[in-house]
From Swiss-Prot:
PANTHER family the record matches: BLR1237 PROTEIN, TRICARBOXYLATE-BINDING PROTEIN
UniProt record similarity statement: Belongs to the UPF0065 (bug) family.
Signal sequence annotation: 1-32
Subcellular location: Periplasm
Chief localisation class: periplasm
Annotated Pfam families: TctC (PF03401)
Name of the featured protein: UPF0065 protein in tcbD-tcbE intergenic region
Any one Gene Ontology cellular component term annotated for this protein: periplasmic space
Keyword line: Periplasm, Plasmid, Signal
KW Disulfide bond (keyword) present: no
């Protein structure tokens, strides 16, 4: 009669549990090491607009400073088109490891209101990293324009509905929205001429092919000083320190409370680990606090911001609510 020993199921189960714990600890440790090693290769910072604009300048100045301390090069990659959608979509579809990040502004909030098919959901497919900077814009006309002030411009617009044109850097960009909001608040009809970025729009403005443009002080200050364009009003509630002689649109046009500020936020793809977001946040905060970065941006009329990721998240939410309300209230659309 043969005897056989039954296997000790309790011991086998215990060994499997211990092996599973060991494997989980090893995997967790390996993952932690990978996160601690971030960044492990150069970081691509996507600017969804052409070179030469304010958003591009902000990214380039900050990226140079970041490259000195983060252990890898931070490379700016301009991916312009569709008011910022092409570049933003590239980041939305990038691996969520923090090596591809985005800088964008109001367009990321409102693009779904102006374009029939946006390939991402801006409130779900991006993780806020940090609010980098804010800056006001300025309404400018060609140097030889017949308009000496904003009241003359608005009077002509009322007398010639749809005849006066304004340039923008694309549908849904902050400078498009500023002009559309001005037209709506002043009860005038303007012709919208969208361009693929600020630079070609400015070229046509200087050449007199369009009547006006609201653009960042950063992009227009040198043109104003060189008298290639004439400034009629700034979009902030207070006069700009670098353009003290230029009135606010609120005061010059008699539109109390008129204010449109461009904010520039940094975003990562959805699913980016919190530790990576916090590292990026810390590095960008450190960069924008550096005196040379503060001074370089100040010379361009840009005010650094900073703070925790939640600061940008709260701003994104409030800006979405604000512009959604304004778009409905004033019936803003792509043609305005």
């Amino acid at each position: 009669m043969h005897s056989s020993k039954c296997p000790d199921l309790a011991n086998i189960g215990r060994r499997r549990v211990l092996a599973g714990i060991a494997l989980a600890m090893t995997t967790s440790s390996t993952r932690a090491q990978r996160l601690d090693a971030f960044p492990s290769r150069p970081i691509t910072w996507v600017v969804p607009f052409p070179p030469g604009g304010a958003v591009d300048a902000i990214a380039r100045i900050i990226s140079r400073k970041m490259s000195e301390s983060i252990g890898q090069q931070v490379v700016v990659d301009n991916r312009a088109g569709s008011g910022g959608i092409i570049g933003s979509d590239l980041v939305a579809k990038a691996p969520s490891d923090g090596h591809t990040i985005l800088i964008n502004s109001t367009g990321l909030v409102v693009d779904r209101f102006f374009y029939p098919r946006v390939p991402y959901q801006s409130d779900r497919d991006f993780v806020p990293v940090v609010l980098a900077a804010t800056l006001p814009s300025v309404l400018v006309v060609p140097a030889d324009s017949r308009f000496r002030d904003i009241t003359q411009l608005l009077k002509a617009a009322r007398e010639n509905p749809g005849k006066l044109s304004f340039a923008s850097a694309g549908l849904g960009t902050s400078i498009h929205l500023a002009s559309a909001l001005l037209a709506a608040r002043a009860n005038v009809e303007l012709l919208h001429v969208p361009y693929r970025g600020s630079s070609p729009a400015v070229s046509d403005l200087v050449a007199g092919r369009v009547d006006m443009m609201i653009d960042s002080v950063t992009s227009q200050r040198q043109n104003i000083l060189a008298k290639r364009v004439r400034a009629l009003g700034v979009t902030s509630l207070d006069r700009h320190p670098q353009l003290p002689e230029v009135p606010t649109i609120a005061e010059a046009a008699g539109l109390p409370g008129f204010e449109v500020l461009t904010w520039c936020g940094v975003f990562a793809p959805k699913g980016t680990p919190r530790s990576v977001v916090e590292r990026l946040n810390a590095e960008i905060n450190k960069a924008i606090a550096a005196p040379d970065v503060v001074e370089a941006l100040k010379q361009l009329g840009i005010k650094t911001a900073g703070g925790a990721p939640e600061v940008l998240a709260d701003l994104f939410k409030s800006e979405t609510e604000r512009w959604q309300k304004l778009i409905v209230e004033y019936r803003l659309n792509a043609n305005q």
